Amino acid sequence: MESIEQQLTELRTTLRHHEYLYHVMDAPEIPDAEYDRLMRELRELETKHPELITPDSPTQRVGAAPLAAFSQIRHEVPMLSLDNVFDEESFLAFNKRVQDRLKSNEKVTWCCELKLDGLAVSILYENGVLVSAATRGDGTTGEDITSNVRTILAIPLKLHGENIPARLEVRGEVFLPQAGFEKINEDARRTGGKVFANPRNAAAGSLRQLDPRITAKRPLTFFCYGVGVLEGSELPDTHLGRLLQFKKWGLPVSDRVTLCESAEEVLVFYHKVEEDRPTLGFDIDGVVIKVNSLAQQEQLGFVARAPRWAVAFKFPAQEQMTFVRDVEFQVGRTGAITPVARLEPVHVAGVLVSNATLHNADEIERLGLRIGDKVVIRRAGDVIPQVVNVVLSERPEDSREVVFPTHCPVCGSDVERVEGEAVARCTGGLICGAQRKESLKHFVSRRAMDVDGMGDKIIDQLVEKEYVHTPADLFKLTAGKLTGLERMGPKSAQNVVNALEKAKETTFARFLYALGIREVGEATAAGLAAYFGTLEALEAASIEELQKVPDVGIVVASHVHNFFAEESNRNVISELLAEGVHWPAPIVINAEEIDSPFAGKTVVLTGSLSQMSRDDAKARLVELGAKVAGSVSKKTDLVIAGEAAGSKLAKAQELGIEVIDEAEMLRLLGS
């Protein structure tokens, strides 16, 4: 069994390691709750054995050393931390200690605030002008982040109003709203940049940039919650009064600050904020409870690292540690393949979590995740639990690499991942069980095969009863089988069969659109049909040949090529043709022989038309030898702009492409 000295040494070493990762490297390896637990364990041992307390123990200081890359600023008034409580019993004990220490019948009013999950900073104003800003650092010395703080729009560079002190040091939290955090990570995933585990890390990473121009691009904000240095003026004698004065001078203060007249009211505030937490739009990890009276604060004083008149009442942790037992792959309704971590069940924010999303192969690589790893799980609000980082220092020897599938785990079709896209997808859109309902609903829709009377509820039942597996099975349905569906009498069933029979006669463009090839909309389908003319020619086309079609680039060409390369898709198409699906033979139009101003031109329609439908306009243009594309590019010859034309019109003007309105189009069609 370890001696007390050994236990203390091990705890202090572990805490120092994690303080370094958190404060210096901005790369925490464990959640806050685990750090708090280790600190409580150390404090309890030191309380029982005060003779073993050392000056360098983590309990005897506030934080960690500042980053060496920044110059340092010494705090004239130390920036202390707060003690924490984690349950009602502990808070009520804190309340009693305050009442007992005051030794009077004087009532205590509490000022309650949100405990923001960001980076604590101090900002010094001289004669109302911002002159410096620093991080907390070790509580005595912080990093000089003046240039970066000046880029935060919420922080005034000059205070306004009356009676502004000659020197005023305000303290508060710089943080990143959730919407901004999500955008930063979205951009990082797209460009291959650093992805942050949570908004707090993103805020710290943004504020500790050596180049202020990078900080300026991050949507950081700030709430003020206290004061350090004060010279040349007086402030109100209550904490809330001071916050309201700061607000008058132009400093942002949270609108959730609330006065509570009793411990019971504090508990009501705590639970109300906990309930509202998912809708705030930014991360908090508890509430801060402060004695409102400055006179009472002075009476209560401080301990070594924290005031006796304030406490942080923390919420149940949103992050916990557990082990990855396996990684499985789910297929979504659009064919997207998502890796899911199967976890050793753990309670996170009051919910038992056994699964967590891993997003995609890039995310697994970024995390360096292996099966068997110890990981940190985060669950914020209603967000699906996710793995935020791996505890590499505790990786087991028998951990296994995660192997991303090359074939769909549902149908066995090839997995496609287009260059530049993070998501891998199943190419078996016509046979994949995971995509079945959505692909069938698309196939029968009005702009595709246009099967009258076959709505979503009928498709749902057909799939659930396993009457239909592929689009070809639709044309094998009988009235007798359909009458087995809910609310489907003999007459309605026969109407559906008749509609299916009618739908067999279609166009090549509609048929291509109905197949649901990724990113092949109506315009692209029409372009492919017009260019290749026959299904056989399209199936045999290379990626290079496909890119010759107007509006088709490398990405769409890859999707089309991969779709027809999948044997299961070709088999379903053969079945559809065998069931009688057909379209007229192509009419070869030689643009040179057509006397029309549109002949041989690539045309784009944008905005709404008042004199004819867009479909009719497309049909007339194709008849007159035009190629109708869905987007504007350098290949575009002409843009027809209807009412409320948007980005396509702007791009055409930017590229110097000819633009005409609907009236001119009608005149030219008539000519």
Curated annotation (Swiss-Prot):
The active site is at residue 115. Its EC number is 6.5.1.2. It comes from the Bacteria. Keywords: DNA damage, DNA repair, DNA replication, Ligase, Magnesium, Manganese, Metal-binding, NAD, Zinc. PROSITE patterns: BRCT, DNA_LIGASE_N1, DNA_LIGASE_N2. Its cofactor is Mg(2+); Mn(2+). Residues 593-671 form the BRCT domain. GO terms for biological process: DNA repair; DNA replication. SMART domains: BRCT (SM00292), HhH1 (SM00278), LIGANc (SM00532). Pfam families: BRCT (PF00533), DNA_ligase_aden (PF01653), DNA_ligase_OB (PF03120), DNA_ligase_ZBD (PF03119), HHH_2 (PF12826), HHH_5 (PF14520), Nlig-Ia (PF22745). Zn(2+) binds at residues 408, 411, 426, 432. One of its GO terms (molecular function) is DNA ligase (NAD+) activity. GO terms for cellular component: cytosol. DNA ligase that catalyzes the formation of phosphodiester linkages between 5'-phosphoryl and 3'-hydroxyl groups in double-stranded DNA using NAD as a coenzyme and as the energy source for the reaction. It is essential for DNA replication and repair of damaged DNA. Belongs to the NAD-dependent DNA ligase family. LigA subfamily. This is DNA ligase. It comes from Shigella dysenteriae serotype 1 (strain Sd197).
